[in-house]
Amino acid sequence: VGSEMCIRDRYDMSLTDNSTIDSRSGMNPKEQLDAIFAAVAPLYKERDKTYSEIKKLLNPYGVCGLSIKELEQQEKKYVKKYFKDQILPILSPQIVDANHPFPHLLNKELYVIASLKQNGTSMIGIVPVPQFVSDILYLPGHDIRYIRMEKVIMEYLDVVFDKYEVSSKNYICVTRNADVSPDDEALEINDDFRLLMQETLHKRRRMAVVRMETAEPLDKELEKYFCDKFKITPAQIYRTKMPMKLDYIFSIMDKVPASLKRSLIDEPFTPQPSRYLTDGKVIPQVKKKDILLSYPYESMDPFLRMIKEAAYDPTVLTIRITIYRLAKKARLVEYLCAAAENGKEVTVLIELRARFDEQNNIDWSERLEEAGCRVIYGFEGYKVHSKICLITYRNRNNIEYITPVSYTHLRAHE
């Protein structure tokens, strides 16, 4: 291994021991994956159908996602001018041929591809859809009419590859394995688990492709080409009619008038305050009787208030807590840091391996350590999902505890 860190790519079929049979399914790993791929295919059809129905339902309200063919003549001129002025100058097209290797495709990013010919030679053109431009182009007018950027780029590929003959066009997206796990040997030689996880996250970008999505069917030659490049099977290539990235929906929601939004969207659920607690201090109420809160039906605010009270309570000695996921803005971390800065002994077990929240948890762990908290990064062989907290305080000559378990508030005494 040396200074390099090994990552177990659990998807890589070449590393899979197919002699191992799972006791529940009775299948080896390859058989399980094949069954998963087969089960996913009909789900795509159901998803496409649902998306199409929702699109049609929104059209009468003036919310219309369109293709180039559906645009009016003036709108087509607007889109073409916008493409030439604003999009074409920032595109980074690539040619894949004998002299130019196939590029690394980023996880869940969109790429417009073209089958090209020049002087009788076939090649592939690839255009990454820029991440720093809007996912959709809004059309002039009062209604919310828009076209997705990948469709705009695909429409004008003949302008991008103007020295080539474009014989087919498509856009694709690959999903890479996200199951990153530090190698056992790397854990043994590296005592900084946080740094190890940061290095591990960088490896995620180059993990094996587990799925490829396409907007249009691939011909057999192109399908074989991508299967060879990504080391996947045809069963892992899925054609979909709905967008491969849905982030743009939040932009559309911001444009919908509030009056219309109320008729189209369910009212957000609001957790209810507990009938067993008053607006006064939480800790004295918990000392009198056990209180059970059920989240998300009841508000988490009493738990946060209790941690804040403990941070400033002179009788509190220690706060111990496990954390699996945190929001980008977390009051809980603020209160734990305040407790440490006020001289409490604060121990936080934060799980750095929370899928897709690893970097967020790493950032928060640094903030906690800076404030003086003792931070533990989980245990080898285990992933900590439990949410428990133990507050220790001195009551005259006794040591007592308040113990929210799964952040439902209980009380215990010693």
Where are the regions that the model predicts?
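Primarily the HKD phosphodiesterase
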Residues: I87-I90, P103-L105, Y312-A371
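Phosphate/diphosphate-binding loops
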Residues: L352, F356-L410
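Active-site cores of enzymes that catalyze phosphoryl transfer or operate on phosphate-rich substrates
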Residues: P234-L317, N397-I402, S406-R411
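A short acidic, amphipathic alpha-helical/loop segment
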Residues: Y225, R305-M306, R331-L336
